[in-house]
A protein has these predicted regions:
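PRPP-associated nucleotide enzymes
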Residues: 1-202
Length: 202
């Protein structure tokens, strides 16, 4: 099986240059290029119409490099699901055989009350809450189970997100993985958007 690595931002290209990801001599190709004159983050525009428009503009694909390939793409988070859903559709339209998504943080269950980085007005703008409402009939029910990656509720949520986005597989990092990577105890890290707790809570 032949593998390729790809990326579209300066950080990834710098990583390639520093040989941090090329230790296995996997060739680097530009199958996706980022069109930067749009919004820096596609979830920032106020209206859904603007968000969908920006999401469609941000990435330019090279179909010849994607056709008949099994691809794995990483993203930092899923907020409303707008950009990722459109990007996945675009990858399949380019002929990708399979699309697998890996998210570097846990599912976002709460809007940020401190920085509001997701620019959401209510928690119901989050795709996770809309899925929970569909699963439970109530977007605020059993949230402690949906934030715990060891529960069946969490597994059901991830599966519903996978179907909504339309990918072959979807996985998230966990709070434990993030904590271990940072090297700090959980009570010193704000994980509010993941599990509803803030600084000082285990």
């Amino acid at each position: 099986m032949k593998y390729y690595q790809t990326g579209f931002n300066s950080t990834f290209k710098k990583t390639i240059h520093n040989d941090q990801t090329n230790g296995k001599q996997i060739p680097y190709v530009r199958s996706v290029v980022k069109y930067t004159p749009t919004w820096s983050r596609s979830f920032m525009p106020v209206t859904q119409e603007e968000r969908e428009h920006v999401a469609k503009m941000k990435l330019i694909t090279n179909a010849s490099l994607l056709k008949d390939k099994k691809v794995v793409f990483c993203d930092d988070s899923i907020v409303r699901g707008t950009q990722l859903r459109d990007n996945v559709k675009m990858l399949y339209e380019c002929g990708a055989k399979e699309v697998h998504i890996r998210i570097s943080c846990p599912p976002l269950l709460y809007g940020c009350p401190f920085l509001n980085f997701s620019n959401s007005k209510t928690d119901m703008e989050l795709i996770t809450r809309r899925c929970i409402k569909e699963l439970e009939g109530d977007a605020y029910k059993n949230l402690e189970y949906y934030s715990d990656h060891t529960t069946k509720q969490y597994a059901n949520l991830v599966e519903m997100l996978r179907k909504h986005i339309g990918v072959d597989s979807l996985k998230f990092n966990t709070i434990d993985i993030i904590r271990d990577a940072i090297g700090l105890p959980k009570e010193t890290i704000c994980t509010h958007c993941f599990d509803g707790t803030s600084y000082g809570h285990k």
